[in-house]
Structure formats: C-alpha cells, structure tokens
C-alpha cells in the first residue's frame, strides 16, 4: 500500500489542504499527514510548529485559537483544514496515517481517539514515541506506528518493533535495503519518495510514502 505525503501537490494544489486530499482519494491513494493542536483544542492538518514559513507570521500554533489561524490562512487562500474535515472527506474508505507532530498531553490524546473513533482506517504515527505509548495506555488496540529518521540505530528499531501492540514502522528510505530491517515482521512504510524512478524501483516490494509524482 502506498500513501501520498500531505496530499497531491502541484501548481494547482498545495500540501495539507482539503482540495489536495480529495484529489489523492480520487486517485485511490491514502494520505499521510501531520497534525497539531490549537490553543482551543482543535486538531489541524499542518506540518510546521509555527505559521512563519507558510503565512509569514512567526506565531506558534499551540498559542492560537483555530479561528485566528483560519483568519490568517484564508487571506492566502490556503485555509488550514481541521482533522475532522479530512476524516469526513475520507468517508472511511481510504487509509489515513496521522502523524502527531508535537508531544500531546494524555487529555489531548484521549480527545483525538474520541474524534477519530468511527474512522477505522486511521493509523496514528509519531517520531515522538511517547505519544504512541500513551495512546496504547488509553486504548490498547489503537492502530499505531513508530516513526524513525536516519540515522537511528538498527538495534533500536528492532528493539522497539518487538512491542506486540505496534502495528507498523515508518522508516526513512535510507533503511529500505537493510537486510535486518527486512526481517522485521511488521508492516513497514518508507518515506519520502520524490521521483518516479525511485517509485518504480521500490513500489512493487515495499510500502511507500511519496509525493509530487
């Protein structure tokens, strides 16, 4: 299974927007996207911790209510979507790998589980592994994955993969040919494939997270 990183992105569509997500679904692909929580506890699909890169405002998402973020983003015609809107668009038909970017409190994680409870295609992933372990403490059968960047030690990846409640691993493509990684009996997704040549080379035998193809 392959996932599109933050939705279809081209001259017409921008990353992490509902229009981009919808185009991905129309092509039959699931989504890998990032989420943050706003000051008023709304979950939004957005990559960065601040608005500086996208909206030229050096403001932290965690310190802003969603209404303020919506006001700023609307001026750029890039309305930041709520996670619940993405869930609705998916119609519970397409896989959604939801990457929790910051470390969430247990109360926020519980709220996240409640908001996504009817969407069985959702999988929670994070580089902040504390998020994943706390999700499992709240609900042990939650679909979750651990994310690893390069160069993480192979030994550490194997050790953490032994947890029976971890459903999958999200790995930098740096690890794609590693023999020890291949032996791990978990679903593995490799990120981020950015060209067609690479996609064609690895797509038949691996699960890929790709973009701009």
Features from the language model and the residues they span:
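Phosphate-group recognition and catalysis centered on beta-loop-alpha active-site segments
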Residues: 1-213
């Amino acid at each position: 299974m392959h996932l599109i990183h933050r939705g279809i992105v081209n001259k017409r569509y921008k990353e992490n927007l509902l229009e981009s997500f919808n185009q991905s679904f129309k092509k039959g692909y699931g989504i890998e996207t990032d989420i943050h929580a706003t000051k008023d506890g709304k979950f939004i699909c957005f990559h960065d911790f601040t608005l500086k890169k996208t909206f030229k405002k050096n403001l932290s998402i965690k310190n802003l209510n969603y209404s303020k973020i919506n006001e700023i983003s609307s001026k750029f015609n890039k309305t930041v979507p709520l996670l619940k809107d993405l869930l609705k668009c998916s119609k519970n038909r397409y896989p959604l790998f939801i990457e929790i970017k910051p470390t969430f409190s247990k109360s926020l994680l519980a709220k996240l589980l409640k908001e996504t409870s009817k969407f069985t295609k959702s999988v929670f992933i994070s580089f902040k592994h504390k998020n994943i372990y706390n999700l499992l403490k709240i609900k042990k059968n939650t679909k979750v994955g651990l994310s690893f960047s390069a160069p993480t030690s192979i030994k550490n990846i194997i050790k953490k993969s032994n947890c029976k409640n971890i459903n999958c691993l999200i790995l930098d493509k740096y690890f794609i040919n590693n023999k020890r990684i291949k032996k791990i009996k978990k679903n593995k997704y490799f990120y981020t494939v950015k060209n067609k040549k690479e996609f064609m080379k690895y797509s038949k035998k691996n699960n890929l997270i790709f973009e701009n193809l």
